[in-house]
């Protein structure tokens, strides 16, 4: 299995307030059970990104807090896996998607995770407590050197 040298900190483009981006040095996240740490190689800018920067999604509570790392269309490489991960290994090339459903509701079980029934259920964080992640919107995104994905 390939091993990668992972630094303690990384550079990330953070949204610190509406219309204010700042390049920051932040800790590299550690993958938990069922998660992978990816080295981000490229990130696209989606039409939703400028709108979020300029405050166009206040009604949806995007971003949920500051500083926030945006970015949900990316490609990279797995550099470390968390406990229980069997489908990926360090060195695998990957591309990301914005949504990870809860895996428990009827829609997720049918493979329709982008319409997860637990998304946004609590009205504040997109359903994180129910297992749903929306990277770059409610959960830290890929405008950084590394990120953890489920």
PLM region descriptions:
Residues 48-54:
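Cytochrome P450 core scaffold surrounding the K-helix E-X-X-R motif
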Residues 17, 39-41, 150:
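A secondary-structure boundary/capping signal
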Residues 102-150:
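NAD(P)H dinucleotide-binding glycine-rich loop of Rossmann-like/cofactor-binding domains
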Residues 1-11:
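Basic/polar N-terminal segments that are highly enriched at the extreme N-terminus
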Residues 25-27, 148:
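Generic structural detector for well-ordered beta-strands
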Residues 19-23, 47-48:
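Short N-terminal binding/cap micro-motifs at the start of the first secondary-structure element
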